[in-house]
Swiss-Prot record:
Its EC number is 3.1.3.16. This is Putative RNA polymerase II subunit B1 CTD phosphatase rtr1. Belongs to the RPAP2 family. The keyword Transcription regulation applies. A zinc finger (RTR1-type) spans 60-139. PANTHER family: RNA POLYMERASE II SUBUNIT B1 CTD PHOSPHATASE RPAP2-RELATED. Putative RNA polymerase II subunit B1 C-terminal domain (CTD) phosphatase involved in RNA polymerase II transcription regulation. GO terms for biological process: signaling; transcription by RNA polymerase II. Zn(2+) binds at C83, C88, C115, C119. The lineage of its organism: Eukaryota, Fungi, Dikarya, Ascomycota, Taphrinomycotina. The keyword Transcription applies. It comes from the Eukaryota. It is an enzyme of class 3 (hydrolase).
Amino acid sequence: MNKKSILKKPKNAQSTQEKQLITWSKSLIDEARSRLQYDFFALEWIEKLVDPVSLETLEEARKYLRKSDYDQVVKERKLVNLCGYPVCPYEPKQQTRYKLEDSGMKVYGGLNYYCSKDCFLKSCQYMVELSDEPLWIREDAREAMKQHLDPRQDEAFRKELENKKIEDVRLLLQALPVGYKAKVGEIVEHPLANEQS
């Protein structure tokens, strides 16, 4: 007589659970990958704002930055000796932390990151208006990521770059003396044929 254990699950149930676990872990990995791409996108904007930018660029960045991201921009700009307000091209001035005013002593802790009180106030106003929501929750950021990660755009950009390189080579060839054009032309026009021989 064949005895069956009541504690063991049937093989079909176990394989179904394993499949569900695999599916769940794949979706979790995809979600983590997606969030990481959003973080890289925000990092690109942080890097873009380290150099002085126009007001339009700063307004565009508002859609993709959180307050903590903007704080990183201010700190990075201080490291490269620029005012913390991304529009300003000047160096920050060494400020004292405390100032005496009519109403008494006031603490200005963040002024060392800025060239003036005006830039400090503009930067604070900008930061207050930024969202605290993560980037992957915002609808406008999702649309931008779809465009940013569109493989057709990347392919079109690569083709455009290749065409530019070919045009640059042709311009260089035109500037060469007559005797050199034949040798260089063979190399440029038929690189694989020359490599095989």
